[in-house]
């Protein structure tokens, strides 16, 4: 009996997303990376499938599904294109989740319905709370506040209709919902190592007004809320890493069987077999951790520590497997004719965009030392 059990609805999600990804995304992934964007037709199809609003309650037009279902969808998407999977992960984990959990009735009605209808949200990732907005200038003019600041990494920024932005003040860190095009806000391109079509870009604010109604989480509870959002995102990011791991392994197995040296396939060489075995071990270890974390969240059980462990294991495993995949491919692993160099760059980028590995290890240690 498998330790991971999925129901019929979740099996259907896996089947539908897998079919969509393998037939429409896999062949387009290289072009998307080259162009640095996801075609509007693909984004529209993702919206029609309900993936942008997968965790949004049905009352707001979403799919109302659980985290296990989200992980299944992200895993299948990432097998074909990690950038697209990351776009969906950010929308659900870093945008939908905080709006669902912390938004007022008015905010939920205004934003969740838009997302379920196809809108995309951006999020400025927070790793070290102490350096958020270190150059942030907040000015007050009576009842109004104005922000001047730069955020060099904003996830989904190039695709987003609105953003969730952390703002640091003397009272702490607040989260604000800011619509695209507000006065004084400008977007600028950034060149990334990996996840090149995921819409990562920068945002700059010059004396932009922050109205009271734009505040999602106040400074008094901002740090706790940000950590809660990160804890949730660990599960989704882990699923993206799992898909990347499987793509690297599948490409390596295929190449090893086809590549001939000294009159036989390199799959017969013990050193290649050892690398493939290590890759498979990492995949299955990550799979168990990820779906355990997801099932605990869905059962309303304590999940944060296992989610951090899953995120560490899967993201570090994806980098390790990516390196092994390049080794298996030899010189071809270095060229863009084969996808493994992209898998590696995407894996390394994914590892750096969430909570940093040292921070997660410290939090795990604190939990077990309580």
Residue spans for each PLM region:
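Flexible, small-/acidic-enriched active-site or ligand-binding loops
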Residues: 133-134, 153-154, 180-212, 217
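Short beta-strand-to-turn element immediately C-terminal to the catalytic PLP-Schiff-base lysine
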Residues: 100-103, 139, 165-168, 177-179, ...
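A short core secondary-structure module
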Residues: 143, 150-186
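Structural signature of FAD isoalloxazine-binding scaffolds in flavoprotein oxidoreductases
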Residues: 64-74, 130-132, 204, 209-210
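Well-ordered alpha-helical segments within folded domains of soluble proteins
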Residues: 91-96
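Active-site-adjacent elements of ketosynthase-type condensing enzymes
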Residues: 116, 129-136
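Alpha-helical interface subdomain recognition
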Residues: 1-80, 84, 90, 102-107, ...
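A short, Trp-centered hydrophobic/proline-enriched beta-strand micro-motif
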Residues: 117-127
